[in-house]
Amino acid sequence: MDDFPSLNVSDLESKLLDYNIRDYEVQNSKHKNNIAGNEKESIDQLSLLNQVCSLKNRKAIDSTKNSPLFYQNVLLSKLACSKILCHATKGGNIEVMGMLLGNVIGNTFVIFDCFELPVEGTETMVNAHMESYEYMVQFYHEMVERSYTRNEENLNIIGWYHSHPGYDCWLSNIDMQTQSLNQQHQDPYLAIVVDPHKSKNDQKVRIGSFRTYQDQNDDTNFYELNTTVFDSELNKLENPLSVKIPFNSIESRNLESNYLQKLSETVKQWRNFKIMEKIENTAHTEDTTTNKSISTPGRIIQTAHEFAFAATSNGNGSRVNIMRSNSVSSIGSSSDIEMEDRNCSAFDSVASSINTIADPSRTSSIHTQMNNQNNQQERNSPKRPHILPAIQSSRYGVIFEGKDRPENKNFNIRTASAQDAFESKCIDDFHESLKNDYLTQKEILLRLKLRQYYRLRMYRDMFSK
């Protein structure tokens, strides 16, 4: 410590973020909110870390011969901690391995970054073979030395890390042999162990730093170093990560619910339209067998009125048939004339629903009495409710609104060819509108689902194996 009179290790630790790694929780949202508030603190930390890097030409005192437990502290950057945890999580139940980059000052390891190492691992063991060491040397020469030399920084390989999936952080016998061998040839050297499964279950990073030593019986043992996480300039790579991939699950669910409701309403309207069309086709077939020519578009509109009125009448009053004859009004009946309940006079035709032309002097009193009776019954009968305007601004219901609604009680749809053509066009427009609404809302729902899938896939690839 005599070579570093201007720098005290205890002061170095007190100026950095002082909290134990076992209590460190990964909270991206909290980190985003505190970026602006911690800007000044990060600048102070950066200047302090630059002071550490400026000691690159000085070698740490080799006090391990006098004190095997000389190294006691580890300063781990948030970037290196996140990369170690992500690599271990991707490995799942298989152990993974990587190298640590940083410097040593006094009895403290300062780790700035790390990189993965391609090795063959099992559930309980991981070893680096010759190919792995060749990759490590080439990666360090091509990526680490050139990158950090441009920034006037010098990062060395000062240790290794590996995972213990599910069985806590410690050094096994093989781990102790590997660490002891590295300490003999390239000390100072550090070993970090992380447990991804317990980190995920406890929502806390379970990580530990270890070194080995020889006890009095010349047996190899290990001890744990105090580990502290600090912030550095290298964490700028983390900040955009939490901003570029937000997951607005609540907003997506609200949009999905709204469009799903609209899609359901469109399908219901389409179903009602098909039911009315089927009823009209059935009625048209029956009328064709009785030699009655009826236009389909007008009957669809009429059937819509009758279908809705039958559902809402509840038995109060009788329904007046629009398709009635000019001779006798039929009330409460589906036929034009009730032949069994009426005694036909000599002036009425049994085979036809149209009155025969008779001598006015002989039939005037009879017809006057019948017309008065029919008019009184029509005035007392309930009026037909207007059903189609339930679809506001619909394309075929508007023809019966206001002044466009036919007021003539004897209005016959069969004779209104121009009206039928207009109704047919309105029905086609309504059919096309329902189809377009269905396709549009379906496409929007699919896009929302795909967007949600892409976000979940990205999160799965980043934080799971």
Swiss-Prot record:
Job of this protein: Catalytic Component of the COP9 signalosome (CSN) complex that acts as an regulator of the ubiquitin (Ubl) conjugation pathway by mediating the deneddylation of the cullin subunit of SCF-type E3 ubiquitin-protein ligase complexes.
Domain free text: The JAMM motif is essential for the protease activity of the CSN complex resulting in deneddylation of cullins. It constitutes the catalytic center of the complex.
Molecular function GO terms recorded: metal ion binding; metalloendopeptidase activity
EC annotation from Swiss-Prot or TrEMBL: 3.4.-.-
Name the UniProt record assigns to this protein: COP9 signalosome complex subunit 5
The species this protein was found in: Candida glabrata (strain ATCC 2001 / BCRC 20586 / JCM 3761 / NBRC 0622 / NRRL Y-65 / CBS 138)
Region annotation Disordered: where it falls in the sequence: 364-386
GO biological process: cellular response to pheromone; conjugation with cellular fusion; positive regulation of ergosterol biosynthetic process; protein deneddylation; proteolysis
Motif JAMM motif: positions: 162-175
Binding-site positions, Zn(2+): H162, H164, D175
Keywords tagged on the record: Cytoplasm, Hydrolase, Metal-binding, Metalloprotease, Nucleus, Protease, Signalosome, Zinc
Residue ranges of domain MPN in the record: 74-216
Quaternary structure (record): Component of the COP9 signalosome (CSN) complex.
